[in-house]
């Protein structure tokens, strides 16, 4: 595993890479995650692909903002990734997105289509979800999206290692169908979020998405260009926060999307069912 700090635009991103041959594949993590969420796949596929796992702006070991920001949404992350690929000398890559990374991957395909050969998603939220965010039975799932925009959220969650662990254990267990999926790496997760600025970096995503999400809930989603690249979606059947039935919205945004489901996983298919996820990735990007 190689680790680098690479200057892009107005920030510096941490990038983990493994594998020197084969198709380059960019792995875009979600929240509450960072580059290491891809380790199960990187360990399985490094002999077939050049795997590139950055920490998104504000996450992991990438540069942090000194103050809360509300301008680091999907387009910002997409432009960061375009600059990163340029710095790495890569003209076109396969892209894997999950959660926040799924939004960023879609924005990358729309804003910089020449850089994206094909797309794989381990859940694929779209603007068409709209009012489903606050439907009966789901509204209680999204409380954290408002809480994390408050100034006190960072102070409360980061009061101590214990409070940080309590907070993130909730999401890693509740969103997983296999409840012990993150247990081997749990302390690494808390190490990550206890680093200065790492709570803020993740919370900034929700500040940045708030206006767009509220508009979509009100029936006014941001118009988007359809994505033409070949696309594969492998959604965890038991995902409680990005529900698998929302896969029905995917064809509204993609011209060439194949959708399947992981019956043994919730939100984190790549961690809960890594063998299956690795097989899907390898088949789609031509590794085996």
Curated annotation (Swiss-Prot):
Broad class of enzyme this protein falls into: hydrolase
Phenotypic consequence of residue 103 to T: Large increase in catalytic activity toward (R)-styrene oxide while maintaining activity toward (R)-epichlorohydrin
Keywords from the UniProt entry: Hydrolase
The keyword Hydrolase belongs to this UniProt entry's keyword annotation: yes
Pfam families: Abhydrolase_1
Keyword presence, Hydrolase: yes
SUPFAM superfamilies: alpha/beta-Hydrolases
Domain AB hydrolase-1: 24-274
GO molecular function terms noted in the UniProt entry: hydrolase activity
Top-level lineage group: Bacteria
Record-annotated active site: 99, 206, 267
Quaternary structure note: Homodimer.
Protein name (Swiss-Prot/TrEMBL): Epoxide hydrolase
Organism: Bosea sp. (strain PAMC 26642)
């Amino acid at each position: 595993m190689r680790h680098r700090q690479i200057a892009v635009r107005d920030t510096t991103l941490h990038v983990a890479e493994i594998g020197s041959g084969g198709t380059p594949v960019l792995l875009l993590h979600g929240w509450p995650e960072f580059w290491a969420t891809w380790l199960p796949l990187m360990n399985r596929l490094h002999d077939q692909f050049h795997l590139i796992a950055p920490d998104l702006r504000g996450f992991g070991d990438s540069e942090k903002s000194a103050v809360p920001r509300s301008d680091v949404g999907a387009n910002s992350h997409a432009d960061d990734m375009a600059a990163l690929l340029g710095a790495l000398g890569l003209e076109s890559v396969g892209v894997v997105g999950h959660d926040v990374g799924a939004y960023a991957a879609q924005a990358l395909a729309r804003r910089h289509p020449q850089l994206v050969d094909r797309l794989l998603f381990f859940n694929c939220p779209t603007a068409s979800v709209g009012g489903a965010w606050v439907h009966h039975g789901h509204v209680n799932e999204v409380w954290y999206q408002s809480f994390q925009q408050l100034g006190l959220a960072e102070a409360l969650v980061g009061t101590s290692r214990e409070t940080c662990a309590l907070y993130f254990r909730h999401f890693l267990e509740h969103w997983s169908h296999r409840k012990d999926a993150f247990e081997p790496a749990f302390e690494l997760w808390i190490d990550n979020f206890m680093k200065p600025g790492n709570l803020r970096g993740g919370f900034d995503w929700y500040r940045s998405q708030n206006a767009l999400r509220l508009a979509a809930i009100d029936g006014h989603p941001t118009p988007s260009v359809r994505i033409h690249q070949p696309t594969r979606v492998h959604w965890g059947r038991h995902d409680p926060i990005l529900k698998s039935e929302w896969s029905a919205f995917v064809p509204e945004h993609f011209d060439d999307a194949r959708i399947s489901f992981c019956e043994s996983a919730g939100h984190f298919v790549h961690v809960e069912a890594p063998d299956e996820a690795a097989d899907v990735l390898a088949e789609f990007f031509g590794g085996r």
